[in-house]
Amino acid sequence: MARRLAGVCTLTALVACGEAGPTLAEREAAARAAQEAADQAMRQRTRAAREADRLAAAWRYQQATIGGGAQVTAAIFAAEDVDTDGHGARAVQLVFRDHEEWGRSAYLVLEAGDFACRPRCTVQVSADDREPQPLAAWRPETDEAIAMFIEGTAAFWRLTGDAARLTIAFPVTAGGTRTATFDVAGLDESKMPGW
């Protein structure tokens, strides 16, 4: 009996001193907090996966025979349309091309307006928050497409592959320069073998 009483007294003393552990309300609050943290982590993973899918879907890859040779392209539109001719914002596209006879090239395509880049010009290219880099460019003597080729294709490709966002400032015939920003993080480099 004395032993039993000593155990009860010890238990009572522990409870009275607050060493019995968290209360039911505290345990429930901790469980809710843990569940909220797990739910938040799941929402973040879902958002990240959705964003990765969006970025990957922004790129278009094509294989075709053009001009008698096999060609592979990776193309993406600017995140926002750009007013290149003073008549409203239109799409600007960035294309990487590998043609078995013409070689590798990178170029911009406008839906309206034109590049002020005949015979040559300089564009400013920046990756993410890095300082802009000047790259030589040129506009071919053709009216088949409104395209401007960017030189230093290999370096430009590497810059694109390392970036989440690529910003290109280019001159236009409407006057001044325009800037197009491309969300390039979803680039699948395996679609352009050998680059």
Regions found by a protein language model. Name each.
Residues 1-15:
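Sec-dependent bacterial lipoprotein signal peptides
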